[in-house]
Amino acid sequence: MDTGQDHMTTPGIRKIDALASRGDPPETVAIGYVTGESTPIGFSFVSSEELVPPRLEYVVVAGMRERRGDTTVTVDLLAQVTNITADVITLDDRIDFLGAETVLNHRVTFPPRLRVEAAVVGYLDSDQQTVRAARNAVLPGTRVHLAPDELLRKFFARSSGSSITLGTLMNRRTVEVALDPNGLSRHLAIIAQTGAGKSYLAGKVLEELLGLGATIVVLDPNSDYVQLRKLRGDEAVPYEHARKAPNHDRIQLYRVPIAGRQRYPDDLCGPSSRYTIRFSGLDGEEICDVAGVPSNAERIREAVVNACIRLRRDRVDFNPRFLAQHLADFSGVPLDDFDGDATDKGAGTVAAHRPDLDDAAAQLDLIRAIDHATTVTVTKRERGDNHSGPTPPRATGSRGASVDDREMVAARSALRYIRKLEKYPIWSQSTIDLNAILQPMKLTVLDLAGAEKGVMAYTAEWLLSNLWQRALGGELTNPVFVVLEEAHNLVPGGRETTRASRIINTVASEGRKFGVFLIVVTQRPSKISDDTLSQCASQLIMRLTNPDDQKAIQRASEVVSQSLLDDLPGLNQGEVVVLGRLTRVPAMVRVGGRVGAEGGADINLIERLERSRKEVEDERFASRRTPPRIVAPIKRQPFS
C-alpha cells in the first residue's frame, strides 16, 4: 500500500508554507476571529480566502482563562476544524440565474464570507501530559491561529523508545503520531472495509510492537503476514536473496501443509514449520466441531464421542481414517461406501439422515430409517454377506426398535463427516509446541490459508484456552498479544457461535487482568459479537461505508460521534482514525511506511493481464518461426 507521504502535499501544509512566506511564523498570524455564539465544546470564526484552514486542520486560541481549583490559569486551547461554509451577500440562495448573471457581469459582487466551525479538543495541564476539557466558552472577537507544530507534538507525540509510531497527522506531515502501548491493555480493534489498508496497518502495528519486546501470535487466514521477515519492496524476491527486516530472526512461521493451494510459495516466505494437530488429542466434541457436525445433531455427536471413548479405552493413538474405520465396523457397513460427500453411496444402507434429530418429524424419520436398516442388516446376515466388525448385541428400545440399531444409524451418519477429515493435511502425531510460541520478543504467524473454518475455530480455541490456563496459573511471564484476523468468522454476533466464541469473549472481558490481549481485525464489525467488540477500548478505524458496520462501532464505543461516522466514508486509503486509550485525544492519521514486506496487497490486474498477453504473443511468434509441416498427398485408390 502506497501511503503517498513522499509526494503528497496537503492543503494544511500549503497554508502553513504560504503564511511562512510572509516572513512571520504561521502561529503568529491570525487566520480568523471568533463570531456568533460559542460554547465550551465549540465555536465559529470568520476567515478569508487566503487564510482559511482546511477541514480537519488544528487551530489554537491563545490566552484562554480556565479555572483550576482555587486558581485561574492561562492556557492555549486546541480545536479542530469540522466544517467550512462560504457565501456572498449578493449571491445568496434566493437569487435566480438571470440575477446571478447580472451581478457577475456588472461586477457588483462582494468578497465571499468564509465561516469556519471548530470543535474544542482541550488544553494541556501543567504537567504537559494530561489533556483537560475546557470549562469556559471562547469570547467573540478572539483571534484564532493555526496550531504550531510544537504544540501538536505535545498532544500526539511520545518518547520514541516506548511508543508505537503510527504515522503523521493527516494535515501535518511534520507532526508524528505515536501510540501509547498501555492503550492496548484493554484490547484493540482494527476496523476497515476491504481495500482500505487494514492488513498493512496491522502489520505496521505488529512490527512496532515486536520492536518493543512483545510476544505476538497471529491467526492469519489469508497469508497477509507471511512475508514480514523481508524488507518492504522485496515481496517478489525469494527469501534467500531478499533483504531482511531488522527483527527477522524473532519472527517464525507455521504453515498448513497444503500443496498447490498456498497464496505464496515457500521460497518467497522463507523457512517455516508445519502447523499440525494431534488428532487423537481432540475429544469427541472437538472432532465434531472441526468436522462440521451441527450442534443439534445430538445422536451423531454421541456416536463420535462414544467411538473416541472406546478407542482411548483400548489405548489407540488414532487418526481420522482409523476413527472412520471404527465407526464403519461398529455400524456394519463397508468403509468405502462413505467417501466424505454429502450423501452415502451404499445402496443397502440409509442414504440420508437429517442432523436435527430432536424434533418430532426427525424422530419419526429416524424410526423409519432404523426399521429399514434393521431389515437390510438381517437380510444381509441371512444371505451370508460379509460385513466387517463385530455384530453388536441387540437391545429393544421403547418403540420396539433396537437401541444398538439407533447407534448404528447414527454411526453411519457420522461417517459422512469423519471421512471429510481425512482430506485435511494438518493431522499428525503431535501438536505445535506452545512454549516455542510464547518466547519473549517473538512474533509467530500461523498461516491458516486453505484450512477449513472448523480448523481455524479450533486453532483459536486451542490457542486461547491454553494461554488462558497458563495465565490463570500465573505461568505467563510476559504479555501476549493474540491477533484475530477475520474475527467475525471466529466470534460471530447474534445467535451464531463457533467453538472459539466462548473463550474469545472470556479473554475479551478478563484477559487484561492476566496479561492476554486481543487485537481484533475485521471488515464487518456488524457481524462480530458485541461482547468482544465492546471490550476493545481502543480502535483504529479506516474507511467504512456500510451503515450497519458504522452503527456497530458506534454501539461498541463511547467516543464515536455521529460527526466522526460521517467522516469515515471520505477517508482515503491509508488514512485512519485513532480512538480510545492509544492517544491523549482522537487523531486522524496518515499511516507511515512500514519496514516489513506486505502480504495482503491486492493483485495488480494490469501486470497480470500484460503477462498473460505476452505469453500469448510469445506463443504466436514461436509458431510463426516454426516451418510448416509438409504432409505427403494421399494417393486416392480407385473404387473397385
Give a label for each model feature:
Residues 213-217, 440-443, 477-481, 513-519:
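Loop/turn-to-beta-strand initiation segments
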Residues 190, 194, 496, 525:
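The conserved Walker
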Residues 188-189, 217, 445-447:
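Short hydrophobic/aromatic beta-strand immediately N-terminal to the Walker A/P-loop
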Residues 199-261:
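Walker A/P-loop NTP-binding active-site region of P-loop NTPases
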Residues 574-640:
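Conserved P-loop NTPase motor module
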Residues 208, 223, 227, 233-234, ...:
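P-loop NTPase motor domains
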Residues 499, 506-590:
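Conserved ATP-driven motor cores of ASCE-family P-loop NTPases powering translocation/secretion/packaging/pilus
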Residues 1-193, 200-207, 212, 225, ...:
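Basic- and hydrophobic-enriched, low-structure N-terminal and domain-boundary segments
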